[in-house]
């Protein structure tokens, strides 16, 4: 599995939409550097979250609402989108997975106006042929494609 593009919005330390294009790198090694708190771990959390539905760091116990950025208001939907390639040469296939974590959203109308309510997360997987894979089976399919579980 080779990551091609990672897009994050309102996710972890990334408030505004941020895209990392791994294809711009023409080397076999990609180095992620930065100051403490700059968002390096969030990049790995986003990749693992896209593939497995939970953050990479089990020590941090990051899941759901905790993944929602504190740098945007509750009206901005947190999301991660990862485009990745599987295989090589003529057998290379490109997949795109998009996950929205469980998050809080501000109610804008009615009796609960101004309060937050929890929104259920979602996932979609676009196959190489452009068709969307059934969301109920996406986690299993991603493990099959990548060949690894989160623990491995």
Predicted regions and their residues:
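Extreme N-terminal "head/tail" segments of very large remodeling/mechanoenzyme assemblies
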Residues: 1-145, 150-151
